[in-house]
Amino acid sequence: MSLELLSKLETKIQAALETIELLKMELEEEKQKNHTLNEQNQQLSQDLTSWNEKVTGLVGLLNDEVSE
């Protein structure tokens, strides 16, 4: 191979490595976002369960009052 071809190959390999590094960084960012969203989803699910329990309790109290 000529030096020119080796130089071009080296440039392409370097560009590929830089692209891989950028993609790795983006992947880590997306993993962190996913983790944060999963935590928020879990909290919202707990909040929803809590509100459902409260509403069910209030509806039960209203039913008791209406029945009396």
UniProtKB/Swiss-Prot annotation:
What's the stated role of this polypeptide? Non-essential, abundant cell division factor that is required for proper Z-ring formation. It is recruited early to the divisome by direct interaction with FtsZ, stimulating Z-ring assembly and thereby promoting cell division earlier in the cell cycle. Its recruitment to the Z-ring requires functional FtsA or ZipA.
> Which Pfam family is one of those matched by this entry?
ZapB
User: What is the taxonomic lineage of the source species?
Assistant: Bacteria, Pseudomonadati, Pseudomonadota, Gammaproteobacteria, Alteromonadales
Cellular-component GO terms for this entry? cytoplasm
Q: Which InterPro entries match?
A: Cell_div_ZapB (IPR009252)
This protein's name: Cell division protein ZapB
Q: Does the keyword Iron-sulfur apply?
A: no
Which intervals of the chain form a coiled coil? Answer: 3-58
Where mainly located?
cytoplasm
List locations, semicolon-separated: Cytoplasm
Q: Which domain of life is it from?
A: Bacteria
Q: Which family does it belong to?
A: Belongs to the ZapB family.
Q: Name one GO biological process term.
A: division septum assembly
Tell whether Coiled coil is among the UniProt keywords: yes
Subunit annotation: Homodimer. The ends of the coiled-coil dimer bind to each other, forming polymers. Interacts with FtsZ.
Q: Which cysteines are joined by disulfide bonds?
A: none
Name the residues that span the membrane. Answer: none
Q: Which UniProt keywords apply?
A: Cell cycle, Cell division, Coiled coil, Cytoplasm, Septation
